[in-house]
């Protein structure tokens, strides 16, 4: 029977509980020398007290983590212009910079912060001397300033300054790449601390590890968090009743719902792209098999039927098929099942094992854990050509989760004999580590766009 439960002692209700300002600390482990140079000039602060957040530093870090940009260090900037009229275009183009972000911040009478910022096309500005003209509505030539890609003003409350910095990063990223930025997203993950009264904790943080919140704690294991497409809920596995069960929890209200509690194993929940179904794994018939569960009709449908183990389902972005890991060929490899016809195809052939697969939102690439002579590492496979690229050199990689724009991957690895979260750009150029200061971190799940 499906049960609706309030979390009670397991979840701290209302606003999510603040565990630490930044329990996950980003440490860059590999550079991006071939990335596109960009200038993020420190914003001018027109006040006497320190700002609650260094907006320009947050933006520079965001853009660097994408793997597509290499921000110029502040100590190597030829100047610090605070608006486009002060930009010396020749000075920046000599550094290879073709885009520059600058701005200013002041505080209004209500105590809020007024942020004025501009993204400048440095190359265009150099070509026109910042004085390009266009025909106005009356047919007269007017100054067009088409080297200013955007010029925006926003009023922001102090506690939301860091969030708004991510918003600016998204705008810059989309303007310069044509793709949506994913800096205003979150990650969910499980932290294990054997010395804590509740050693298993499900937490949520900004994608960069800041603003970490505790959403659930338990004396029994928690596993496999997965986001709903609207970013409101998490599906996860709990052992609180003595066996693996699947729950869905609203992370804002604290309400949760038990979905499955079949004999033996219930695991690996994953929302469908439309949010109407869960793919999951049950072993009620013996071996692990993939099922779908309709969240409206409560209908359970078996997808795989074999003597082998089939697990780790993940929906194709079009919702018409699932990929999953199976040992039907002897060792774990990744397969794809068409939900209409039931036909199954093997996707991975390189490496002795491939598991934990996810497909990028555009459907082009399969990201998975690939086992070779060098160990378990993240790899990316082109689904059209079959070409394989190993993305990481970390130890015992597992549980990859792709950003909603397909640009980055967060995963669990081993560092200093402890599970930590790591991050790699989808092209493998940028790598970082997000080590927790208070436990072993596993099973990351990247949120949808929020």
Curated annotation (Swiss-Prot):
The protein's role, per its UniProt record: Part of the Tol-Pal system, which plays a role in outer membrane invagination during cell division and is important for maintaining outer membrane integrity.
Keyword Secreted in annotation: no
GO biological process, one term: protein import
KW Signal (keyword) present: yes
Main localization of the protein described in the UniProt heading: periplasm
Designated name of the protein: Tol-Pal system protein TolB
Signal peptide: 1-22
A Pfam family matched in the record: TolB_N
GN (gene name): tolB
Family per similarity comment: Belongs to the TolB family.
